[in-house]
Amino acid sequence: MREEKFYSVRMRASKNGSHEVGGKHLSGGERLTTYENMIHTVNALLEKGIYHSRGKPDFMKIQFECIDEPIQLVNPLHIETHEVESAEKGQVLARKLLEKAGIQKKMIDLAYEQIPECSGLRGAILFDIHSGKRIDQRKERGVRVSRMDWPDTNFDKWTKCYQMPRNSRIKEALVLATKVSEHPATIAELCWSDDPDYITGYVASKKLGYQRITKLKEYGNESGCRIFFVDGLRDLETYIDYLEKQPVFIQWEEENDA
């Protein structure tokens, strides 16, 4: 795997112009691929951006670059699904899971006050569990996790073992959550999609694994959330550099789950 050249491919799509001029963010995507599979990968991201429930884009950017750094191999987080009756009960459970991950209740309350800021962000908010403040200084951009993927053949093995659907949403979310949780500065992540037709979200951490919650908002709601609860005492610049630039492949091995 490491002898073969890989490329980071990124897509972002928006409506009413590009993100830089205030366009509405619709969709984004991240893949790692070989040069031979470039056309297939680009076409998949193109299709994702064009056929999106948030609307039809009038701006899209797809770019790729060669990866020169060694690719880190990471085992996926253990996954657990919680069936809940309503978004309200889902949010109560999410707060409990964040506490279980080691975050004080008052800090969780402060983080939830930041959620309106998440709407329309291309990336995540970094929330310091010590100060109770947002510390990424990225305003409407947020921090976008990049350079990550899960090879299809290995993902298929994982879905069969856990009897999970071969679902691109689950794959993309688990890839991102695993990369984020792998860094020691990450305490936990809280996320739900801005897609109006997708209401499932999750709480993830190295300690808890990937805790999938079936309802965290109502259908038709385009407000999403992605908050990384971080130890602000660690080097923030190094942490953001890892999130944005460190290439990571998810590689599941059955014996690692034993």
UniProtKB/Swiss-Prot annotation:
Cofactor field: Mg(2+)
Pathway(s): Metabolic intermediate metabolism; pimeloyl-CoA biosynthesis; pimeloyl-CoA from pimelate: step 1/1
EC number: 6.2.1.14
GO biological process, one term: biotin biosynthetic process
Enzyme class: ligase
InterPro entries: BioW (IPR005499)
Gene Ontology molecular functions: 6-carboxyhexanoate-CoA ligase activity; ATP binding; magnesium ion binding
Record key words, sorted: ATP-binding, Biotin biosynthesis, Ligase, Magnesium, Nucleotide-binding
Catalytic reaction(s) noted: heptanedioate + ATP + CoA = 6-carboxyhexanoyl-CoA + AMP + diphosphate
Family: Belongs to the BioW family.
Record text on subunit structure and interactions: Homodimer.
Listed name of the protein: 6-carboxyhexanoate--CoA ligase
